[in-house]
Design a protein with these regions (language model features):
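Secretory-pathway/luminal and periplasmic proteins that interact with or process carbohydrate-rich
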Residues: 66-68, 124-133, 142-153, 223, ...
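Catalytic loop of the DD-peptidase/beta-lactamase superfamily, centered on the K-T-G motif
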Residues: 27-70, 119, 159-161, 198, ...
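Active-site SXXK
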Residues: 43, 57, 63, 89-114, ...
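Active-site-proximal loop and beta-strand segments within enzyme catalytic domains
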Residues: 73-203, 220, 256-265
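Hydrophobic h-region of N-terminal signal peptides that target proteins for export
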Residues: 20-28
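A short, well-structured edge-of-sheet supersecondary motif
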Residues: 48-81, 113, 170-180, 237-240, ...
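Short, well-structured active-site flanking segments
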Residues: 77, 97, 103-122, 217-245, ...
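Bacterial N-terminal signal peptides that target proteins for export
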Residues: 6-16
């Protein structure tokens, strides 16, 4: 089934007390007791103001969750509260899973991210405007291949159509239809007037191509590869691209910005945004990246491989290999799509990270996104208390 998308005793002592009171009264981003009822109330007030059904969040130190909260309802219609087991759509956070899979293959010597991506596919990949220039996996990992986003469904008609859960067309079909000249949905606008490797242009199509490369080289369907080689080894059985793998009782309802519920769906570019997970399980994945590719006794990447993925490629934007390096040494990724607003980040040196998930996307002034989001600001301020040695 297919359907269209709707598109935070001395004068000195008295002065210090005055400062604390002033901050609590006049800066809602800085509640006096972070993690207390004041803290929770500040988050709930922001949720109510923006009509957000639920928010779940956690802070990780080293490999342990040191704080976790669930606010609001996973299902408003029948008043099911959100919990740390509620499964949310992760949206573009999913791209860090693609980066993990690609770097696993590179680590095994099955691909070279600086060679022609066509070497690892059953068809060539060339920008017709620059036919002599190769497109490499690294370019795709840094959104610099020259491929369209697309920004809107008009740019590549039908690319962002919705499908019933787990029923998206095969990746090979999507890519041959949209990417190859002569494909049923091919339009010249799929390639931009930018030579491969020259300009950063965010591309869901490009990261979907990476996912298909993983599928073709490994011989495993992409969602199955991720489940077997990333999620299950990390102790994440309630995490998958496929809804069929998950407990339906734990799935959050997805909502539009107008608070209307929408059916669970998938898209042609599902690798770029369709991982579903809970905050408690996603913490394992974030902890692995925060600790050089290992979560407790499980290693999904060698430390050198993880370091390469986190190496800065574009100082202007902070882009690494699908991860973003931000001011202060924090690496993160956001996600936003109908039914979800998500964000996660970690500080590599201090080994502290945070995750925020919600079951509604807000187009503007989203409170869970940095730098100005109120909910993000509250949680980030609390996370800062865990920086430094354990």
């Amino acid at each position: 089934m297919r359907f269209k998308m709707n598109i935070k005793k001395s004068k000195r002592a008295k002065s210090f007390l005055f400062i604390l009171v002033f901050m609590a009264l006049h800066c809602r981003l800085l509640p006096r007791f972070a993690g207390s009822s004041d803290f929770d109330e500040a988050i709930l007030e922001e949720m109510q103001a923006r009509r957000i059904p639920s928010v779940v969040a956690c802070i990780i130190k080293n490999t342990d969750i040191v704080w976790m909260r669930s606010y609001g309802l996973a299902d408003k219609e029948i008043s099911i509260p959100a919990t740390d087991q509620t499964i949310y759509l992760l949206a573009s956070i999913s791209q860090t899973v693609i980066a993990t899979a690609v770097m696993q293959l590179a680590e095994k010597g099955l691909i070279d991210i600086d060679q022609d991506v066509g070497l690892y596919l059953p068809f060539p990949v060339r920008n017709p405007n620059y036919p002599q220039s190769i497109v490499t996996p690294r370019m795709l990992l840094t959104h610099s291949s020259g491929l369209a986003g697309p920004k809107t469904d008009d740019e590549l008609p039908g690319f962002y159509d919705w499908f019933s859960p787990d029923a998206a067309p095969p990746l090979a079909q999507t890519l041959m239809d949209y990417l190859l000249p002569g494909g049923s949905s091919y339009v010249p606008a799929v390639w931009k007037e930018s030579a491969p490797g020259r300009m950063e242009l965010y591309s869901n199509l490009g990261v979907t191509l990476l996912a298909y490369m993983v599928e073709f080289v490994s011989g495993e369907e992409f969602s199955s590869y991720c489940r077997e080689h990333i999620f299950l080894p990390l102790g994440m059985p309630g995490t998958s691209y496929k809804i069929a793998d998950l407990n339906p009782e734990n799935l959050a309802v997805w909502y539009l910005e107008n608070t209307q519920p929408i059916p669970h769906y998938t898209r042609r570019d599902y690798p770029a945004g369709q991982v579903k997970s809970s905050v408690s399980e996603l913490a394992h994945f974030l902890a692995a990246w925060m600790n050089g590719g290992a979560y407790k006794e499980v290693r999904i990447l060698n430390s050198d491989t993880a370091a390469e993925a986190l190496r800065l490629h574009n100082p202007a934007s902070g882009l690494c290999l699908l991860w973003n390096l931000m001011i202060g040494g924090w690496y993160g990724h956001s996600g936003g799509v109908n039914g979800a607003s998500t964000y996660m980040e970690f500080h590599k040196q201090d080994k502290v990270g945070l995750i925020i998930l919600s079951n509604m996307y807000l187009e503007s002034e989203n409170p869970i996104y940095p730098p100005a989001g109120k909910i993000y600001g509250l949680i980030r301020q609390y996370a800062n208390q865990f920086r430094g040695p354990a």
